[in-house]
């Protein structure tokens, strides 16, 4: 979606309602697609990967927080939810359906791309404190992401 403030300068109330309807519909459908891929991942036996948000949304098996940006006093609604599978997902499927002789090579490929895995037990408990494994977050730096969200709020 384009920058919201640019659009508001030149549209009527009716146009604004249509813009919001379209934004809500597109964002909702993107979230439903992401959630569907996430649940299919569970049916294939894949667990949550709560570090993928720190690696360019590398997996649908994370819990994605809506990604909003702020630039020049404008909220940007592009790519609120990622589309398609991530790099971790593709390697997970490759690993799950490969011969034993190929597994080490696939794991090395994940390491070379800095693709990591952090499960629920490091991200979900009250006493968990892993800096890169948190539910409903984005980005590599939790403090910087919080600052971005606070600007938007």
Could you describe each region identified by the protein language model?
Residues 1-36, 43, 66-70:
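Metzincin-family zinc-dependent endopeptidase catalytic domain
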Residues 23, 27, 55-153:
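Conserved catalytic/binding loops enriched for acidic/polar residues
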Residues 24, 35, 49-50, 82:
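Generic structural signal for short, flexible, solvent-exposed coil/loop and linker residues
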Residues 32, 48, 52, 65:
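Active-site proximal loops enriched in glycine and acidic residues that flank catalytic Cys/His/Asp
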Residues 40-55:
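Catalytic Zn2+-binding segment of zinc metalloproteases
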């Amino acid at each position: 979606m384009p920058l919201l403030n640019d659009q508001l300068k030149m549209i009527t109330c009716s146009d604004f309602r249509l813009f919001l309807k379209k934004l809500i519909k597109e964002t909702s459908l993107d979230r439903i697609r992401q959630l569907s891929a996430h649940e299919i991942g569970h049916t294939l036996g894949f667990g949550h990967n709560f570090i993928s948000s720190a690696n360019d949304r590398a997996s649908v098996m994370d819990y994605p927080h809506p990604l909003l940006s702020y630039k020049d006093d404008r909220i940007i609604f592009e790519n609120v939810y990622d589309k398609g599978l991530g790099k971790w997902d593709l390697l997970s499927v490759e690993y799950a359906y490969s011969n034993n002789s190929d597994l080490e090579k696939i794991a090395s490929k994940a390491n070379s791309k800095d693709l990591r895995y952090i499960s629920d037990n490091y991200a979900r408990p009250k006493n968990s404190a892993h800096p890169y494994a948190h539910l409903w977050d984005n980005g590599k730096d939790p403090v910087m992401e919080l600052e971005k969200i606070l600007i938007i709020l």
